């Protein structure tokens, strides 16, 4: 996430005295979307919220972005993270503002224990009304599970990630429902 501090000024009487945090946040948002993708793995960028401004006739002195970048591997995630820092350094200079970046979370490569794959499939074959689909070798999303699984493996345990399919209309939507009618 980013907190951007500018300099307020009266938009009509002395706009030259202001350093517009809102415009800096807008510029950063557009540049984040333009980070070049990486041939070593999939990448994602999301600016989810922007809050800025104090009034219609005031050069905005404060802006806050809630955002994230993701990379398929830790190396690609680092590539994305480095771009974020470079973008905000440039925005700070161009708009004469001060950005403070805060890591609010992260994702990591989803490591699994291949020794569990056959065991999990054997158990799933005995679950009524379940159809096994081909294995997904590089599942995406579920950053919380990726972090949990990594910690289990680091402590000598084994873990596997299971996707339980359902007929829904997309994640993170207001009408999200896994349509589980039997549990």
Task: Identify the function of each model-found stretch.
Residues 104-183:
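An extended, acidic, His-containing surface patch that forms the Zn2+-binding/catalytic region
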Residues 1-111:
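Midchain, well-structured core segments that form catalytic/ion-binding scaffolds
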